[in-house]
Amino acid sequence: MMASERNQSSTPTFILLGFSEYPEIQVPLFLVFLFVYTVTVVGNLGMIIIIRLNSKLHTIMCFFLSHLSLTDFCFSTVVTPKLLENLVVEYRTISFSGCIMQFCFACIFGVTETFMLAAMAYDRFVAVCKPLLYTTIMSQKLCALLVAGSYTWGIVCSLILTYFLLDLSFCESTFINNFICDHSVIVSASYSDPYISQRLCFIIAIFNEVSSLIIILTSYMLIFTTIMKMRSASGRQKTFSTCASHLTAITIFHGTILFLYCVPNPKTSSLIVTVASVFYTVAIPMLNPLIYSLRNKDINNMFEKLVVTKLIYH
């Protein structure tokens, strides 16, 4: 009998410890996370709606941005509601199937965002370094392929890692020292040998980070070279400002994900990993629409119009 069959027959249950060691701050944390999740939902769905409604925003960059917002919304929705529930209930349990599903979908959207940001970096490279060929290179077909490829690779990575998690064995009741069903804490809760699953996760994480960062760093090295060749200071500043939002987003995202998923032994610093997980899963999906909208006048103007219209008719 395979381990996955034993798991299904014994129906293991995971107990998410999360912030159970700090009961005095659970209510404040609930309110904070509820506010953050509300901002995340409104910000990302609002971004998608605004881009669809405003014809001025039917650009290639906004096409990628709308999919980035969709990815952030889906990722946050997979994780945050369960986190909020566990802050107010006495028994912080999640079924084995529920835990695996949470990891599976979180992995899909996490990997998708990694390569979506890389595709956006390539878009900025073409816009700055090859402006006359921009519409030719960044064709509708190529943009669709870049987005579809990001989603597809996210699904492939998730299915591989999920398959090997299903091959592990767990006790009927297992404690997980985190607030989400992350790969590292799931394998640490298994009593079977997780070596293959751990190595695969490490290899996939390294491959995803290195390959996406190569695209991003190469793109921005060429962008900076082009900017420095410009004679006009105002031209350099204007060109750089078009990349500032994306630079901020990738710095926050990749800095956090490198720390979380490229550390061979996260057990040695579980508290730090938990804090970083909170930032990665809760804060980043909220920050992305704020980062991009603050520097885009068309998005700001459209948002103001929607708010004014809402206030007038309600």
Curated annotation (Swiss-Prot):
Record-level GO cellular component terms: plasma membrane
Glycosylation sites: 7
Entries under PROSITE patterns matching the protein: G_PROTEIN_RECEP_F1_1, G_PROTEIN_RECEP_F1_2
A UniProt-annotated Pfam family: 7tm_4
GO biological process: G protein-coupled receptor signaling pathway; sensory perception of smell
Record localization: Cell membrane
UniProt superkingdom: Eukaryota
Extracellular side: 1-27, 78-101, 163-198, 261-273
Entry keyword set: Cell membrane, G-protein coupled receptor, Glycoprotein, Membrane, Olfaction, Receptor, Sensory transduction, Transducer, Transmembrane, Transmembrane helix
Transmembrane segments: 28-48, 57-77, 102-122, 142-162, 199-219, 240-260, 274-294
UniProt GO molecular function: G protein-coupled receptor activity; odorant binding; olfactory receptor activity
Alphabetical list of PANTHER family matching this protein: OLFACTORY RECEPTOR
Function as written in the Swiss-Prot or TrEMBL entry: Odorant receptor.
Family as reported in the entry's similarity comment: Belongs to the G-protein coupled receptor 1 family.
Name recorded for this polypeptide: Olfactory receptor 5D13
Top-level taxonomy: Eukaryota, Metazoa, Chordata, Craniata, Vertebrata
